[in-house]
């Protein structure tokens, strides 16, 4: 194909030079008396050109074609080869740089060593544009119809592929592929994605990774994650069990201590109140008894005196009878009075004792209710503390060196729940930092921070 193409170009050059009456060649760099390319039957069989014994001169063929540089060639209507060794082939083609080549109608090689091949293709300095309407910036390469390498040192391969001007050192490969950043390789665009197939596994840090490698790493990561999760769960359970036992022991000791204290206080209070009641009842009973006895003595003495006086007045015969009647009456009154006093004392003491016991029971119940409320609050705090601890233990440590992570976790114990958030940083393979805070509602907040060294 390359050999045939060269032969075709040579034939086209010979035909154009023989047939165009308007072809011309300027003086060599303004030096007079130097002849241009001559075309004659004695020309070289391969090119149809014959040079005199002078420096090489440019050649042109076609209507208004212009070859101005040394060794330059312009073929086609208005074709222009402006600098040394430049080649412009095709109507309206332009090659303005040294060693530049423009092949195709309206093609433009606008810088040194620029090469274009295709209708209306354009290449800047050191650029290569192949395909109709293909265009490049300096040192760019564009291959394919309407392909554009607008950034320096960029490559666009494929129909309508495009590297934007601000995406230097980027490559777009494939039909309508577009780049979106510097130093990138694109094989599609935002709504057209393609796959790289038959990709070998990467071996260096800068190599691409294929799906097989990725799956293997995912499985390895999952295995490590599961192992680490199991270890963390076991540690969390052990920590929770230890804390639960410790908190439960403290709560039980506190409860036992407070219960014993409450019972002792209630016993002392009840004993003191009962003692006071008994003392009051005893004092009242003694007072009533003394009053009754004094009244009975006064009454008996009065009756005795009256009876004695009457007996003395009415005769000695009646004295014994009157005295007996007086004694019976006195005994009856004394017995009745004593029974009344004892009954009154018993009722008073019974009522006072019942009241004391009732008040003591009410006081004891109130204290126990207060103790229950405190224990309930203590249980709630313990549950929230364990839930916060579980949430903090669920936070992950970053595994990659130089990586910072942000992690969140939840935890619960019985009816309490907590939310924990935290962050960690792995300084290197042996040193890592981590901190977190947990919230369990109201003002219940727990936090931790850790520093890890491995070897």
From Swiss-Prot:
It is found in: Cell surface; Cell outer membrane. GO terms for cellular component: cell outer membrane; cell surface. Changing residue 49 to Q: In strain: Serotype O:9. InterPro entries: Adhesin_Head_dom, Coiled_stalk_dom, OM_adhesion_Yersinia, Pilin-like, Serralysin-like_metalloprot_C, YadA_C. Residues 26-363 are annotated as: Surface exposed passenger domain. The keyword Endoplasmic reticulum does not apply. Induction: Induced at 37 degrees Celsius by the temperature-dependent transcriptional activator LcrF (VirF). CDD domains: LbR_YadA-like. Changing residue 155 to D: Less than 1% of wild-type collagen-binding activity. The chain crosses the membrane at residues 402-412, 416-427, 434-440, 444-455. Keywords: Cell adhesion, Cell outer membrane, Coiled coil, Membrane, Plasmid, Protein transport, Signal, Transmembrane, Transmembrane beta strand, Transport, Virulence. Its main location: other. The keyword Membrane applies. Residues 1-25 form the signal peptide. Residues 364-402 are annotated as: Outer membrane translocation of the passenger domain. GO terms for biological process: cell adhesion; protein secretion by the type V secretion system. Gene3D superfamilies: GSPII I/J protein-like (3.30.1300.30), Serralysin-like metalloprotease, C-terminal (2.150.10.10). Residues 403-455 are annotated as: Translocator domain. Belongs to the autotransporter-2 (AT-2) (TC 1.B.40) family. NCBIfam families: YadA_autotrans. The signal peptide, cleaved at the inner membrane, guides the autotransporter protein to the periplasmic space. Then, trimerization and insertion of the C-terminal translocator domain in the outer membrane forms a hydrophilic pore for the translocation of the passenger domain to the bacterial cell surface. Presents a lollipop-shaped form which consists of three domains: a C-terminal membrane-anchor domain, a coiled-coil stalk domain and an oval N-terminal head domain. The N-terminal half of the sequence reveals the presence of repeated motifs with the consensus sequence NSVAIGXXS. This is Adhesin YadA. It comes from Yersinia enterocolitica. The lineage of its organism: Bacteria, Pseudomonadati, Pseudomonadota, Gammaproteobacteria, Enterobacterales. The gene is yadA.
């Amino acid at each position: 194909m390359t050999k045939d193409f060269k032969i075709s170009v040579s034939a086209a050059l010979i035909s154009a030079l023989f047939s165009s009456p308007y072809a011309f060649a300027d003086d060599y760099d303004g030096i007079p008396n130097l002849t241009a390319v001559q075309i004659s039957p004695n020309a070289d069989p391969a090119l149809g050109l014959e040079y005199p014994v002078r420096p090489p001169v440019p050649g042109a063929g076609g209507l208004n074609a212009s070859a101005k540089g040394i060794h330059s060639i312009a073929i086609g209507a208005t074709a222009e080869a402006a600098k040394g060794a430049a080649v412009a082939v095709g109507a309206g083609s332009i090659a303005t740089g040294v060693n530049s080549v423009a092949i195709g109608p309206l093609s433009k090689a606008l810088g040194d060593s620029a090469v274009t091949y295709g209708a209306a293709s354009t290449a800047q300095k050191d650029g290569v544009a192949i395909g109709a309407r293909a265009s490049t910036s300096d040192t760019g390469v564009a291959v394919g119809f309407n392909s554009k390498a607008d950034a320096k040192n960029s490559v666009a391969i494929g129909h309508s592929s495009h590297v934007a001007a601000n995406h230097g050192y980027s490559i777009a490969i494939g039909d309508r592929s577009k780049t979106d950043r510097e130093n990138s390789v694109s094989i599609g665009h935002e709504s057209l994605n393609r796959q790289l197939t038959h990709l070998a596994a990467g071996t260096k840090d800068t190599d691409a990774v294929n799906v097989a490698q990725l799956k293997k790493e995912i499985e390895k990561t999952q295995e490590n994650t599961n192992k680490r999760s199991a270890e963390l769960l076991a540690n969390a359970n052990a920590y929770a069990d230890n804390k639960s036992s410790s908190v439960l022991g403290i709560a039980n000791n506190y409860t036992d201590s407070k219960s014993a204290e409450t019972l002792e206080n209630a016993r002392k209070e009840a004993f003191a109140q009962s003692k006071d009641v008994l003392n009051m009842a005893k004092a009242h009973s003694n007072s009533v008894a003394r009053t009754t006895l004094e009244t009975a003595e006064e009454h008996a003495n009065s009756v005795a005196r009256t009876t004695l006086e009457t007996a003395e007045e009415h005769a000695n015969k009646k004295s014994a009878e009157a005295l007996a009647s007086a004694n019976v009456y006195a005994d009856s009154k004394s017995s009745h009075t004593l029974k009344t006093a004892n009954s009154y004392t018993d009722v008073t003491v019974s009522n006072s004792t019942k009241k004391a016991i009732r008040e003591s029971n009410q006081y004891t119940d109130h204290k126990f209710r207060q103790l229950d409320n405190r224990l309930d609050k203590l249980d709630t705090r313990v549950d929230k503390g364990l839930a916060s601890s579980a949430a903090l233990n669920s936070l992950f440590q970053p595994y990659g060196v130089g990586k910072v992570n942000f992690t969140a976790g939840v935890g619960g114990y019985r009816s309490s729940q907590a939310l924990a958030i935290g962050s960690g940083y792995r300084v290197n393979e042996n040193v890592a930092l981590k901190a977190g805070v947990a919230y369990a509602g109201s003002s219940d907040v727990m936090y931790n921070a850790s520093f890890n060294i491995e070897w």
